[in-house]
Amino acid sequence: MLVLSRKIGESIIIGDNIEVKVLKIESGTVKIGIIAPTNVKIYRQEIYQTVAEQNKKTISEIVNSPDDLKHLKEVLKNVNKNR
């Protein structure tokens, strides 16, 4: 893990097109701003983890056999084609 120190108004650059800037530090909370292309998905870790857990639970409720899994794979493939 890379650990960096930044002051208010200072940034770090990730890759060629993502900037993370420290906007405010108050009461033990750091407010950051992120500038990134619209195709880069950005989530708070706790939200990402909750959604992933819900997705796993939903799939386990839907998939009862290998045939169910094959069908789900085909459905998802078709959904992605139509995007």
Curated annotation (Swiss-Prot):
Compartment(s) of residence: Cytoplasm
Pfam family, one: CsrA
A GO cellular-component term linked to this record: cytosol
Single GO MF descriptor: mRNA 5'-UTR binding
Keyword line: Bacterial flagellum biogenesis, Cytoplasm, Repressor, RNA-binding, Translation regulation
GO terms of biological process kind: bacterial-type flagellum organization; mRNA catabolic process; negative regulation of translational initiation; regulation of bacterial-type flagellum assembly; regulation of carbohydrate metabolic process
Known role: A translational regulator that binds mRNA to regulate translation initiation and/or mRNA stability. Usually binds in the 5'-UTR at or near the Shine-Dalgarno sequence preventing ribosome-binding, thus repressing translation. Its main target seems to be the major flagellin gene, while its function is anatagonized by FliW.
Subunit comment: Homodimer; the beta-strands of each monomer intercalate to form a hydrophobic core, while the alpha-helices form wings that extend away from the core.
Family: Belongs to the CsrA/RsmA family.
Protein's name in the database: Translational regulator CsrA
Gene: csrA
